[in-house]
Each structure stands twice: as C-alpha cells, then as structure tokens.
Amino acid sequence: MIRITDKSLCCGCTACMNACPAQCIVMRRDREGFDYPVANPDLCRNCGKCTEICPMPDIKAHVHEESLSQEQSMKVIEEGGVIYAPSMNPDMTVGYAEVSDASEQAGLNDDMCVQSDLYATFEDVKYYLEDGRKVVFKGVPCYIAGLKAYLGGEQEGLTLIECGCHGVASPGL
C-alpha cells in the first residue's frame, strides 16, 4: 500500500491511483495545495501495483521541450485522434482537456506547468489507444513518466510532448 512519508518523493502524477485494481487510492490536496495519493487500508488488497508503477525513481531532472504545431494537431484530429493538454477549468483549477475537434484547440494551454487534475485522464488515454486511435499527451515530465508507467511503456499511436519544468507550482496559488 502506498504511503507518502516524504512529499519530495511524490510528483502527484496519479499513476498509482489509476493502477489500483481496488480503487482504494484517492488524491488529497495538502495545505500547500498539492495533490498526493492516500490509500484506504480497508479497501487495499496489498497487491503492490501502486508502488510498482510509481515513476519517481525513473524521472530524470531534465528539461525537454517540444511543441506540437497547429498542422500536426490538425493531422492527429483529422485521423480521428485526440489531444490531451492542460486547460483552465471554469472554477479556475487546471485540468486536462480532451480535444477531438479542431475548433476546441483554442482552450488548450500549451505552456501551463502547474499540478493539474489528471484523475481519469490516464484511463481515457489507454481506452483510446486500445481502440486504435492516435493520442497526443502534453504535460510535465513527471506526468509523462506516470502515463508511460501506467501504460507499461511507450505505446504505438501515442505522442508525448513534455513542457519544460523545474518543479510545478501549487494549484492553490
């Protein structure tokens, strides 16, 4: 069962929450505004999937910045694919938007590097990939590492775009 005793060892990527077959992990916001996983011991099966999938030991401290051009985005969408990128929610929190129509791209925030509400995004990405659709996922390196861990590595049809990051700001700011 996952227990966060040192917050510097958790990036809040939600991979553990998404991997848990018992669905006993929820993300809770701390006083500083960061989300961390908390497991319900009454529901936990002690299968270890949450700790196995954690990408933190593999995250390298580097900045690798790419951009997805409008033309590339349009091509993915025209081919029936979807794009996931940070987007401002109406309640002024940052979540992930799923875009499958060219007219929806305007709401994406390509340069937003704050801790975002990912919640079911990893499950949705997996569903679309299993359905044979192309998926573009843009995010900070730890979210990309978490998604790759959740999916079991690189996947055909998945394009990952990292935004530069030197540590995300709290969404509570």
Question: What is each stretch, according to the model?
Answer:
Residues I2-I4, A15-G33, K49-S67:
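Iron-sulfur cluster-binding cysteine motifs and their immediate structural context
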Residues I4-T5, A39:
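PAS-associated C-terminal
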Residues D6-C11:
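Short, surface-exposed ligand-recognition loops at beta-strand->loop->(often short) alpha-helix junctions
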Residues V26, V38, I53, Y84-P86, ...:
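Short, conserved beta-strand segments within well-ordered enzyme catalytic domains
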Residues R31-C44:
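Short linker/helix segments within small regulatory modules
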Residues P41, G48, Q115, Y119:
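Electropositive phosphate-/nucleotide-binding environments in soluble metabolic enzymes
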Residues A61-L173:
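Iron-sulfur-associated redox domains of electron-transfer enzymes in respiratory
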